[in-house]
């Protein structure tokens, strides 16, 4: 059935339209009102892109994100995540692309951990780290891409500890991390590195703008604690020299306070973090501009040790006042598509009309799915399992 869908997709291509930067071939012209899908053959260099343009004014279309296997740990293909979302029955996934960066290997059990923001159906699953490269949509449909930070602390008695991470590896620099059931079955921590505190009484799921009391049920230094389905684990690094750590005793009560800043981010229903802001106010990231100018010799299609300057498969998300853009550029296939540098990717986004954009995970992860069929040609010759995904969904009547 999936092969059949892919064949049909290739047949449903309208007459090519030539633009200044290349040729556009519309795909599935009647798939949904307010949705424009096309293949874009970039004329400047050998690169093939797949683009979805969603009208922000079409009430039946929606932006969503999805977590692999519905938890942080583990990986899943974009197509499988889209299938699971459609099976819920209220909306159908029309377009799906791969999402953000994180641990693709095992990394001592942390395979699947995201490195940046992920909010799904109003649940805060991981906090923002690259604060410039985040995108979110509120329940009212407002698009947000302003720099965002998490401000959080864990109070115990008169003392407060800053909470730095949610569902992250202990190696990511945080001295206090909260693990919710959304991570997986256990924390995968090392017993020599910190103290783990089992807390109860926190209403789940965790959300932005969250304030609730909790009770300490257990304190352990064994590591890799099981995460209860109705509670959480607070991990505190042994490097944190704070007298308040000794206050976490069984039976003690405290308060967890969390908010995103600026405050409009507390209203997001779906949000995702990438790596590197490509566009802001219609202008390319100045760092990318400077790197492009400093490049001594630009060789089309060349891969480089500096990833920003290397021609690679790319995935990006952009928007303007009227349109959401999801883009995947194929690469590492010289006779078909060599890929793009990040400066080139940003330039194409401007050409298409985007004013704001962030870079998502690329390389072998870059995947573009329409109606359960992988449309692009992933560089690994097969669809890769990834960490999260971005959807355009449509209401099911």
What does each model-found stretch correspond to?
Residues 19-397:
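Gly/Ser/Thr/Pro-rich low-complexity, intrinsically disordered segments
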């Amino acid at each position: 059935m999936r092969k059949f869908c892919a064949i049909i997709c290739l047949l449903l291509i309208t007459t090519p339209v030539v633009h200044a930067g290349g040729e556009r071939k519309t795909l599935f012209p009647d798939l949904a009102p307010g949705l424009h899908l096309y293949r874009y053959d970039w004329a400047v260099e050998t690169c093939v892109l797949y683009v979805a343009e969603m009208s922000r004014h079409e009430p039946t279309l929606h932006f969503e994100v999805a977590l692999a296997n519905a938890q942080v740990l583990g990986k899943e293909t974009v197509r499988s995540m889209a299938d699971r979302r459609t099976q819920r029955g209220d909306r159908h996934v029309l377009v799906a692309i791969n999402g953000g960066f994180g641990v693709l290997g095992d990394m001592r059990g942390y395979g699947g951990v995201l490195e940046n923001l992920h909010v799904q159906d109003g649940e805060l699953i991981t906090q923002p780290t690259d604060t410039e490269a985040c995108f979110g949509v509120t329940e009212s449909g407002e698009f947000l891409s302003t720099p965002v930070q998490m401000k959080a602390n864990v109070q115990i008695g008169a003392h407060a500890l800053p909470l730095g991470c949610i569902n992250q590896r202990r190696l990511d620099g945080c001295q206090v991390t909260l693990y919710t059931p959304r991570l997986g079955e256990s924390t995968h921590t090392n017993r020599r590195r910190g103290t783990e505190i089992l807390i109860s009484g926190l209403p789940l799921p965790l959300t932005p703008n969250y304030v609730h009391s909790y009770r300490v049920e257990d304190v352990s230094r064994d590591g890799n604690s099981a995460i209860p389905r109705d509670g959480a684990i607070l991990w505190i690094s042994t490097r944190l020299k704070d007298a308040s750590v000794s206050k976490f005793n069984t039976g003690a009560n405290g308060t967890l306070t969390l908010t995103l800043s600026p405050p409009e981010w507390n209203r997001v229903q779906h949000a995702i973090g990438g790596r590197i802001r490509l566009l802001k106010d219609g202008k390319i990231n100045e760092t990318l501009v400077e790197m492009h100018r400093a490049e001594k010799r630009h060789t089309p299609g060349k891969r480089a040790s500096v990833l920003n300057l290397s021609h690679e498969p790319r995935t990006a998300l952009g928007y303007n006042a009227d349109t959401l853009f999801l883009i995947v550029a194929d690469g590492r296939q010289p006779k078909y598509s060599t890929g793009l540098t990040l400066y080139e990717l940003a330039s194409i986004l401007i050409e298409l009309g985007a004013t704001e954009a962030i870079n998502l995970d690329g390389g072998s992860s870059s995947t573009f799915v329409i109606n359960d069929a992988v449309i692009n040609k992933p560089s690994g010759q097969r669809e890769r399992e990834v960490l999260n995904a971005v959807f355009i969904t449509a209401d099911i009547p």
